C-alpha cells in the first residue's frame, strides 16, 4: 500500500498547529495515492501528529491539514458553505462542537465502533461529533505554601482565606466560559453567580493564559489558581521540580470539571466514509495512548484517576451567552 502524506497549511492565527506538523511533511511525503482528506484543526499541541501520520501510512490517504483558531475555522466553514474543501473538523472545547452542530456544519455519521469506543456523554446523540481527548479544568496550588487539603472544591476558591492569593485566567478564555456555562446548566443562575462573586471578592490577579497562572503560583505571586491540567504537565517537562500541584476538585461532590477536544465529519464532504474511518482510527486505544503520552490529555474511553463530572454539551452550550453576560456582570474581565 502506498504511503500517505501529511501536509500542513496555515489559516489565520494557527501558527502553533502548522509548527507542530511541519516536521511531518518531509517524513511522510512521496505518496502516489490520489485519495486525500482535508482536515480543519484548531488543536495546537506539540507532538500529536503521530496518529495522523500512522493513518496516512496505513491507508495511503493523503491528509491535508489546515490550522487556525476554533473561531477562525468556524467562520471559514460558515463562509465556504457547500464549497468547503474540508472533510473533518477537529476543534477544542465542547462549546465549539455544540456551535458547529447548531450551525449545521457537521454531518451525522453512524458507526458501531465509535459508539463502542466513545462514552455516551462524550459524543453527540445524533453522531455529529465525537470526543477525541479530555482535559480537566481544576485547582492548582503551590506545593510549597498550600497543603493538599486546604482547598478541594471550586467553591472553596471563594473562601476569604484566599483574598489576594488567587490567580485566574481572563474571563474571555473559552475554557472559563465553558466552565461557567456548565455550572449554570447544573447549579442554576443564583448558585453560580454566588460562587463567582465570592471569587471576585478575593481580588484575583487576572492573567492572560493558563501558563501565566501556573508560573505566577510558582513565583509566589499567588498561591492558588484554576487551569487545564495538561499545562502543568508541560511545565514539568521543562522542570521536574516545578513547585505546583493539581488538586482534583469536588471529589466529594459531582467530580472535577472536564472539557474535551472533538471532531466530526463536515457536512457535504465527498469523503464521508474515509473521514469516518479516520475518526474511528483516532479514538482507537493505540492512538488514544499516543495523544495521552504526547500531550498529557486524558483518553475518552479510559479517562481519569479521579471522579469526573459528566458532560452535558447541549445543556452547557445553551447557556454560553448567559455565561458571558454573568462573567461580565461580576467583573471577571
Q: Where on the chain are the PLM-derived regions?
A:
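Short beta-strand->loop
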Residues: 40-43, 125-129, 141-143, 149, ...
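Ligand-binding "clamshell"
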Residues: 100-108, 120-127, 235-249
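A bilobed periplasmic-binding-protein/Venus flytrap-type ligand-binding module shared by bacterial periplasmic
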Residues: 138-145, 181, 185, 258-274, ...
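Early extracytoplasmic/lumenal segment of secretory-pathway proteins
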Residues: 24-99
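A structural signal for short loop-to-beta-strand junctions that line the ligand-binding cleft
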Residues: 84-89, 107-139, 155, 165-168
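An extracytoplasmic/periplasmic, membrane-proximal ligand-sensing/linker region
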Residues: 190-192, 297-333
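Periplasmic-binding protein-like
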Residues: 164-172, 281-302
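Ligand-binding pocket segment of bilobal, Venus flytrap-like solute-binding proteins
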Residues: 171, 175-178, 182-249
Amino acid at each position: 500500500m502506498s504511503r500517505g502524506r501529511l501536509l500542513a497549511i496555515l489559516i489565520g492565527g494557527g501558527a502553533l498547529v502548522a509548527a507542530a506538523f511541519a516536521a511531518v511533511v518531509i517524513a511522510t511525503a512521496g505518496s502516489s495515492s490520489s485519495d486525500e482528506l482535508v482536515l480543519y484543526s484548531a488543536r495546537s499541541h506539540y507532538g500529536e501528529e503521530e496518529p495522523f501520520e500512522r493513518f496516512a501510512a496505513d491507508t495511503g490517504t493523503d491528509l491535508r491539514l489546515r490550522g487556525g483558531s476554533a473561531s477562525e475555522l468556524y467562520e471559514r466553514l460558515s463562509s465556504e458553505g457547500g464549497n468547503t474543501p474540508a472533510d473533518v473538523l477537529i476543534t477544542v472545547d465542547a462549546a465549539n462542537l455544540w456551535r458547529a452542530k447548531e450551525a449545521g456544519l457537521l454531518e451525522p455519521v453512524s458507526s458501531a465502533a465509535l459508539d463502542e469506543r466513545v462514552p455516551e456523554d462524550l459524543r453527540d446523540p445524533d453522531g455529529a461529533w465525537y470526543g477525541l481527548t479530555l482535559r480537566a479544568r481544576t485547582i492548582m496550588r503551590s506545593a510549597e505554601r498550600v497543603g493538599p487539603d486546604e482547598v478541594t472544591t471550586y467553591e472553596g476558591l471563594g473562601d476569604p482565606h484566599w483574598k489576594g492569593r488567587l490567580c485566574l485566567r481572563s474571563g474571555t478564555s473559552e475554557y472559563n466560559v465553558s466552565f461557567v456555562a456548565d455550572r449554570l446548566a447544573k447549579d442554576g443562575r443564583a448558585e453560580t453567580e454566588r460562587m463567582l462573586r465570592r471569587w471576585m471578592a478575593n481580588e484575583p490577579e487576572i492573567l492572560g493564559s493558563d501558563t501565566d497562572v501556573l508560573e505566577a503560583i510558582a513565583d509566589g505571586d499567588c498561591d492558588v489558581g484554576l487551569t487545564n491540567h495538561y499545562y502543568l504537565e508541560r511545565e514539568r517537562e521543562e522542570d521536574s521540580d516545578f513547585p505546583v500541584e493539581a488538586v482534583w476538585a469536588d471529589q466529594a461532590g459531582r467530580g472535577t470539571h472536564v472539557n474535551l477536544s472533538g471532531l466530526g465529519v463536515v457536512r457535504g464532504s465527498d469523503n464521508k466514509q474515509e473521514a469516518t474511518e479516520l475518526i474511528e482510527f483516532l479514538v482507537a486505544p493505540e492512538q488514544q495512548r499516543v495523544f495521552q503520552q504526547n500531550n498529557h490529555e486524558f483518553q475518552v474511553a479510559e479517562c481519569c484517576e479521579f471522579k469526573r463530572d459528566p458532560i452535558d454539551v447541549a445543556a452547557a452550550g445553551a447557556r454560553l451567552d448567559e455565561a458571558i453576560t454573568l462573567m461580565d456582570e461580576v467583573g471577571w474581565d
